[in-house]
Structures are given as structure tokens and as C-alpha cells.
Regions:
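Extracellular/periplasmic envelope-modification machinery, especially enzymes
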Residues: 130, 196-203, 213-214, 221, ...
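Membrane-interface helix/loop caps of multi-pass membrane proteins
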Residues: 1-233, 248-251
Length: 497
């Protein structure tokens, strides 16, 4: 659950390395294409045509791949080099045209308008890009803007334009030189500060920026420039350089793999034993798989939000201990039976109920179970902010919320009735207790002063009961109406008197 769009992404210090991986894949392939261009660009006939057209053809193919994957496999389209190649190749083509004196601004006026239009495109891409349709078509804005931006600051032979003054000064050039180091260091520094002292205040943000600059400058001068200076002074054969590089890669891979394999033993955190506290899928311990199997012919369809996955280890145990076959469908914000609001009218969730019911109707047998698993209450905290308890309590009882709960109850009642006609039982968990602070972020000496931990963990049980009452009452009404509905009160177990 540490993917690029996971809620936990801001706490993963390695999250940004995937884009570096895509970039390095490009640099493995691109030199071959570029070498053909260098050798054959002055040729006539087939060789000259190949030299000038191979990169544009590959770029067009990549752009189409980006379009197709965006429709059919959006995750692949976002992560893989075939669908991202065109963004990097665009800069290569611009350089090729510049060597032929093409597209170069002929006046300061042309350079200036390209600068500001390019800058506007980049800002528009940052502000309006839809991640559901990225890189195609929304990356076109930022790529086009970057091309115009670069084009505006090349040497025009027209004296010192505003573009040259802005972006060819010593500070801008130096920032460009250390830009790789800036990208490499900024994310782990920000992630570690989020884990420890926090990154909420202006002072903390300035500290993060300062540390990023210091680490970037140090790695640039000692590593990037240092290696270049050392290589120029030492007479090392190309074979030795390649062999040394491969050795470093192998050792780094082995060391990193070993580090991750043993991270639970190396961790300084009290939360290192994720089997105890982290509910996501773990191998079940101490289970005699031949002990029961009393539900060997039964199936359970778990349909919900992220809490459907939070039950993974428990469901795995049920499968091994009782023999029940478990199918887990986590639908995020479109979870069925969430009870806080109707789903069918929620933007982006239209048709979700019908799709899931079709799956159940095709697979389920009489006596099977559908488990609607959701949180079903408001949070007092999320990954990024604290919520005022009194405002949250008021929200749980205001007229708009009560109306949404009523419509959600009607919607869920229809689903339960349809399942009853199939002979399928329904299990719904009552709202669970919520904390004032996330334990996995506030349990260690190095993060207890984090602003996210300032309220501590304790919450009055009466407050939680009061906040959950509208949803609980609505579920109890459903329970009285439908004989095939079972309510699971885990609140009383997790928060006893």
C-alpha cells in the first residue's frame, strides 16, 4: 500500500525514485538513437532519412501508446517508459532542430513571447492537470511549455534579452546544475521530517528547504563533480570503468535488498512489528489448516473501502481455519453500504452498485456471505491534518448528514433485499472507534513532538458513541427489516466499558 497514489506516499522516502528509473531507462536507449543521428545526419538517401525520422517516429509511437494505455491500463501508462518516452524525446528533437538553426527565435520579441507562453503552459499543467488522464493528454501542456521555455533562452545573437538576463544568470545556471541533486534529496528529507518533527510550520518548511539545498550542494560537488575530477586525473580504461560501475550496481542491489529484508530487526521504531498493529495482509501464524474447514463450500464477498483490506489478515485466517473462499473488492470512495452518504449519485461512482451486484449474482450460491466493510464514521485526523472534534461531532448530526444517511439507508436496503432473494447473507460492521492521533506516527521518541500528535490518543467513549449514533441507529433499522442482515459490533470489543 505504498504505491505512488497511496495515502501513505508522503511518508515513503523512496517514492520519487521510480521517475529516476524511467529517466535512466531512457538514457540507456536514447544514446543508440542519437548515435545514428550523429553519424548519418549529413547523409542522403535512406541513412539520412532514418537519422532524422527515427526519433520523431518513436515519439509519435510513444504518444499513441500513452493515449492507449491511458484508456485501458492507466497505471501502466503512468509508470512505464514506452508511454513516457515522448516527453523526454521532445527535448532531444528540439536539440536536433537547433543544430540546423531551426526554430531559433530571430528577435528578442519572439524569445520573450515564447518565454511567457511557455511559462503559462507549465503553470496551467501544474494547476489543472487531471491525474486520471496523465500523461496523456495533460502532460502535453507541461512538455510544450518546457520546449517553448528552453527555446526562448538559447543564444539568439541579439544581445541581452530579458530571457537571457532572467535565466542565464549565475544563480539560475547553478540551480540548473544541481537540479538532479535537488530532486534526489528533497523527497527523503521531506518524508523524514513528516515522520519526525513535522513539516507543518513555516520554520519547519524553511528548515527542510535549507537541508535540501545543503545536501544537494554537497552531493553535487563531492560526488558528481568529484567523480568527474577523479576520472580526469586517473588513467582508467573503459573496461575497468564499466566493470567498476557494474560492481557498484550489484553491491548496491544486494545491500539494499538485505536492508529491506531485515528492516524489522534494524528499525528503531516501536511500530516495527507490523504483524501486531498493521492490519494489511500478513501470513497467518499458528493455524492448523486441517482443524476445521466447516465452511469449505461457502464464499465471502468483501466489498468496501480501504477497511476491506484492513481485514485482510483476519479474512486470511478465516479462509485457512474455516475453509471459506474470500473475494476482496476495495472500492475506495465508491464502497457499497458506507451509510454516510448514497453512492449511486456520487460523482465517479455511477454504476458501481450494479457492477458489484452482477459479480455477486454470477458467483454466489445460497448461504454465501457479502460483507460490506467500511469505517462508517468521521475521522478526527487524517494523514495531513487534525480535525476539530466539536465541529466533527456537529457535522455528524447536521441536517445535511442526516439526509444523506437516510438516502444511504434506502440504497443499502435495496441491495440487502436483492441479496436476500439470492439466499445470500449480509454482514455489516458497525462504526469503529477513531483516534485523535495516528499511533504509527506518534509512538516513538523521535516523533512525539510532531504537531500531528499534540492531542494524544485518548478519546472519550461517550463522544464516539454520540458521533456514531445516527449511523448506528440507521443500521439497526435495517437489521429489524432484513432477516439476512447481521450486524458486527466490533466497537464494544475494541472500546469496552
Amino acid at each position: 500500500n505504498d504505491g505512488y497514489f497511496s495515502p501513505r506516499i508522503e511518508y515513503n522516502p523512496f517514492a520519487h525514485t521510480w521517475s529516476l528509473g524511467v529517466e535512466e531507462q531512457f538514457y540507456l536507449f536514447f544514446p543508440v538513437v542519437f548515435l545514428l543521428w550523429i553519424v548519418w545526419r549529413k547523409k542522403t538517401g535512406v541513412k539520412g532519412t532514418i537519422a532524422w525520422w527515427i526519433l520523431p517516429i518513436l515519439t509519435i509511437a510513444s504518444l499513441y501508446t500513452s493515449y492507449w494505455l491511458g484508456l485501458n491500463k492507466p497505471d501502466w501508462g503512468y509508470y512505464l517508459i514506452p508511454s513516457r518516452f515522448w516527453e523526454l524525446a521532445a527535448g532531444g528533437m528540439l536539440y536536433q532542430y537547433h543544430t540546423e538553426k531551426r526554430f531559433i527565435p530571430t528577435s528578442n520579441f519572439n524569445a520573450t513571447w515564447q518565454l511567457w507562453i511557455g511559462f503559462s503552459f507549465i503553470l496551467a499543467g501544474l494547476w489543472w492537470s487531471d491525474r486520471q488522464h496523465f500523461p496523456f493528454p495533460w502532460a502535453l501542456l507541461s512538455v510544450t511549455g518546457t520546449l517553448l521555455f528552453i527555446n526562448s533562452v538559447i543564444d539568439q545573437g541579439q544581445g541581452k534579452s530579458i530571457c537571457k538576463q532572467l535565466f542565464n544568470n549565475a544563480i539560475a545556471v547553478y540551480l540548473g546544475k544541481i537540479s538532479y541533486s535537488l530532486y534526489l534529496w528533497h523527497w527523503p528529507i521531506y518524508s523524514l521530517m513528516r515522520w519526525t518533527i513535522g513539516l507543518e510550520t513555516i520554520g519547519q518548511q524553511l528548515l527542510a528547504l535549507t537541508l535540501t539545498m545543503l545536501f544537494s550542494m554537497t552531493s553535487y560537488h563531492l560526488i558528481e563533480k568529484g567523480i568527474q575530477r577523479s576520472a580526469s586525473k586517473l588513467s582508467i580504461s573503459s573496461f575497468t570503468k564499466v566493470l567498476g560501475g557494474l560492481t557498484v550496481i550489484v553491491l548496491t542491489f544486494q545491500g539494499t535488498s538485505s536492508l529491506f529484508d531485515h528492516r524489522h530487526r534494524l528499525s528503531l521504531s516501536d511500530t516495527k512489528d507490523s504483524y501486531t498493529w498493521y492490519a494489511y495482509d500478513h501470513e497467518v501464524k499458528n493455524i492448523n489448516e486441517e482443524a476445521g474447514q466447516i465452511f469449505g463450500t461457502r464464499q465471502m464477498f468483501v466489498i468496501g473501502d480501504s477497511h476491506a483490506y484492513a481485514y485482510s489478515t483476519m479474512l486470511n485466517e478465516a479462509s485457512k481455519r474455516l475453509g471459506v473462499s474470500v473475494y476482496n473488492y476495495a472500492l475506495g470512495r465508491c464502497a457499497l453500504g458506507i451509510m454516510l452518504l448514497p453512492i449511486n449519485t456520487r460523482a465517479g461512482c455511477e454504476g458501481t452498485s450494479e457492477r458489484m451486484m452482477d459479480i455477486v449474482e454470477k458467483k454466489a450460491n445460497p448461504g454465501d456471505i457479502v460483507f460490506f466493510a467500511s469505517l462508517r464514521t468521521y475521522r478526527l485526523i487524517d494523514q495531513w491534518a487534525l480535525f476539530d472534534p466539536q465541529s466533527t461531532l456537529n457535522k455528524s448530526k447536521n441536517a445535511s448528514t442526516i439526509k444523506d444517511i437516510f438516502h444511504a439507508k434506502q440504497e443499502t436496503s435495496i441491495l440487502i433485499e436483492r441479496l436476500d432473494k439470492m439466499g445470500v447473507n449480509v454482514l455489516i460492521d458497525l462504526p469503529k472507534p477513531v483516534f485523535n492521533a495516528p499511533p504509527f506516527r506518534c509512538s516513538d521518541w523521535f516523533n512525539q513532538d510532531n504537531p500531528i500528535c499534540e492531542r494524544g490518543f485518548y478519546v472519550e467513549k461517550s463522544f464516539l458513541v454520540d458521533m456514531m449514533t445516527p449511523v448506528v441507529d440507521s443500521l439497526k433499522e435495517l437489521n429489524q427489516k432484513h432477516d439476512n442482515l447481521i450486524l458486527w459490533d466490533n466497537f464494544s470489543i475494541l472500546c469496552p466499558d
